[in-house]
Amino acid sequence: MKNINNKVLALVVAVLLAFTGALNAQTAAKSKNTAAASKQNSADVIPLDPAVRTGKLPNGFTYYIRKNIEPKNRVQLYLANKIGSIMENDNQRGLAHFMEHMGFNGTKNFPKNDLVNYLQKAGVRFGADLNAYTSFDETVYQLPIPSDDPEVLKNGIQIMRDWAQDATLDVAEIDKERGVVLEEKRLGKGAQQRMQDQYLPMLFNNSRYSDRLPIGTEEVLKNFSAETIKQFYQDWYRPDLQALIVVGDIDVDAMEQTIKAKFSDLKNPAKPRQRTQYSISLLNKNQFMAVTDKEFPVSVAQVMIKHPETKL
């Protein structure tokens, strides 16, 4: 789309908030159609690939293993935590993302920078290969490593185990990382964020999602105590909210036994906090918004459609 004057952005966000089950049925025929559509949706749930070995340990920790011989002698490890910024208290805004950073700043078996240094020596590039992300509802760590080196594979699983519940959260390392995260927040400021600040309240219908962006607030990032982030880690990094995904050129049986041996001792809190399911209410109508910013170099049109959650 051509940009008028090459300076002014016209960002069109059309939010089409309509799906089966959200409409108010006004006739018996509509109700029948809605029920039929819901039944069809249930039949369309994506089945689990039969090649995936899955299981759940007594502590609630879930695992998924799939053998994939290409690329040869490589394996991808993912630690998925069912926790993101949506569950942060007001004094924790930004700490789900900050906690993700701290996983690389010292664990029980890899203190300080040893984790990154070890993996780089094994040929794993920090950022390009070794990485993680935090969203509203999840935090996921990824680690691609060689699978033909038993020592590297063993340590890769140990790193996943350390991330799950053995990050050290050293006070000095926390304070060092504040500057990194604050700089990340600063770099995110600009035309895109200014426009986002305008349309997200409409997109999220002023729900909790509107004020729980993963980057957090500057006030919290500058001032939170070590105890505050440790409490967040203890509350939410727990086996009943975690899963390990292993895909690659590996022995599935051996990997399953390794996972059982390594992750069965993870502990859930004596009084686990409830993970509240937040949602975005539908308005049963189409919405339109146009926002502009002179620093945004292109024109963009977006059509967004809200669908029911897909159960896997």
Segments (PLM) and residue ranges:
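Short, surface-exposed beta-strand/loop micro-motifs that present aromatic residues
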Residues: 52-54, 62-68, 230-235, 285-293
